[in-house]
């Protein structure tokens, strides 16, 4: 069972504690393994993070997956597993068979970075930085894009916003024509989309750029809405 309980992508909703306990019970009942991908688990803003499934697991059914690439830098390419003890030998053999040339220098430097307390300091600072950017994004959207309804997940480096029904296609096309590069939520559905909106990333944007983009988006949406209203008026008998 693969899951991202800390922060579901793309809507960002965390898995509730009752659902986590129910999932663990189902895994135990069926003898299944849970692969817990701690996606964006480091960036929780509005409340204390819930315990990981791995920390709640008393039966050894959870394989916990984490990475340093997102919280430090992408080219680090250093990840890790927290395994139930009975799986250690099998995973070690598989790891050696697939890739026996890990960068030992990167691992040693990262371990020293953690032991010295620098990693914890970096996480605190980056969490505050990204929370301030998230808060600014929500404030600017409320002012300039009142048509958008943000999903307040309280986590991650992106924010999903919902559009009025029927608006995703026309507004996305207009925004992309201006170079805004918005990702519609409809792209994430295997079947028929049930929600319309966008996924807005803010992790790499400074405050000035965030303000500028929100104002451009607001102006675009007002222009598109006015154009639709004019077209509707022309179609009236």
Task: Tell where the protein language model's regions lie, with residue ranges.
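PLP-dependent class I/II
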Residues: 2-237
């Amino acid at each position: 069972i693969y899951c991202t309980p800390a922060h579901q992508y793309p809507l960002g909703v965390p898995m509730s504690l009752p659902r986590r306990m129910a999932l663990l019970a189902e895994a135990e009942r069926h003898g299944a393994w849970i692969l817990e991908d701690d996606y964006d688990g480091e960036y929780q803003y509005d409340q204390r993070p819930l315990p990981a499934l791995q920390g709640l697991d008393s039966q050894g059914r959870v394989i916990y997956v984490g990475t340093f690439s997102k919280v430090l830098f992408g080219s680090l390419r250093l990840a890790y597993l927290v395994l139930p003890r009975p799986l250690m030998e099998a995973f070690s053999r598989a790891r050696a068979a697939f890739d026996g040339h890990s960068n030992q220098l990167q691992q040693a430097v990262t371990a020293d970075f953690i032991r010295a307390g620098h990693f914890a300091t970096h996480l605190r600072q980056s969490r505050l930085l990204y929370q301030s950017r998230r808060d600014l994004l929500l404030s600017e959207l409320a002012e300039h894009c009142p048509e958008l309804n943000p999903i307040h997940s309280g986590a991650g480096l992106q924010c999903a916003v919902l559009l009025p029904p029927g608006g995703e296609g026309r507004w996305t096309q207009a925004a992309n024509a201006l170079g805004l590069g918005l990702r519609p939520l409809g792209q994430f559905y295997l079947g028929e989309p049930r929600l319309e909106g966008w996924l807005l990333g803010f992790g790499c944007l400074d405050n000035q750029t965030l303000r500028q983009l929100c104002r451009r988006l607001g102006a675009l949406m007002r222009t598109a809405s006015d154009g639709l209203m004019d077209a509707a008026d022309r179609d009236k008998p």
